[in-house]
Amino acid sequence: MQKKILVAVDGSPPSRQAVDYAGRMNNLIQGLTVTLFHIQPPISQFLLDEAKRSGRAQAELNKIAARNAEASRGLLAGYRETLIRAGLAEQSVEPATRPHNQGLAKDILDYAQNGLFDAILVGRRGISAVQQMFMGSVSAHLIENSPVIPVWLVDGNVRSTRVMAAVDGSESALRAVDHMAFMLSGNPEVRFCFFHVTPRLKDYCEINFGAEAGGGLETLIAQGDQRCMDDFFPAALAKLREAGFREEQIETRTDTTLLSVGETILEAAREGGFGAIVMGRRGMNKSFFGGKVSYSVSHKLSDAALWLVP
């Protein structure tokens, strides 16, 4: 079965890292096809308006558009060669370019949805102190606004092909497992790790309730979480079995932490040598807590990929 990934690129180092990651995924994903997608630079609104009134301005506009398209095709040709050298068949790598229309993220999402892609892969920009709130706006907008298609966010050089699914018992986490099972189906060698962090009271509320009240609430949270995961794990394992995976390919880990849930997930991924973290974008009942965890992981990700499933 074909698995279609849209790799959104420009000429930046993060885009080159995203392309390299797509090449490595060819060894993990059976039936992988990649479309390299580049949005051309926007053209001045002044020139667009002038072109409606002046033939000379229209001629200049046509020249700029032609140069943009030519530069885009050259960029994509180089990335295509990278993927072919990585082992993808020529017919499995398609370049595509479009003029800038509504905005980078919106244009990428529209193309991905119209093309029925299984995932959008993008490199994450480095985050400076000033950029912290924006997280490299294109990747941030893709993550927040993709209604259906999972977004794969790559940071740095990802060498490992090991996959860890960070799960919290939510429907979003089950959709993430379903996505992971589909993308990796047909590979008898792949190994998964289900990783669950038992949440603490502080993960839901920063108010200090005192030792007695806080202890009772901690117990209630732990008991509720255990009941939830007792239902979740059989459902998740069933999805993997339906996709053809054997039980010996699957490992399950549960951890408690004094850190935040997001930091614990990242630490477990680093210590376990996992190259990809798979998780749902929202937690139980689309809670802020679940969204806060995925937000934290996406911001602090380093030399790894995050498969974030709506």
Locate predicted features.
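Short, flexible loop segments at boundaries between secondary-structure elements
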Residues: I149-V151, S298-P310
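Short, surface-exposed alpha-helical segments at coil->helix boundaries
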Residues: A65, A69, R73-E81, Q226, ...
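Structural beta-alpha unit
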Residues: M1, G78-I120, A238-I277
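Short, structured interface segments
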Residues: M135-G156
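Solvent-exposed polar/charged
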Residues: N27, Q113, E144-N145, R270, ...
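Small/aliphatic-rich secondary-structure junction motif
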Residues: M1-N62, T161-A222, K239-F245, E251, ...
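Glycine-rich, Arg-bearing micro-motifs that act as flexible, cationic patches
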Residues: Q102, A119-H141, S160, R270, ...
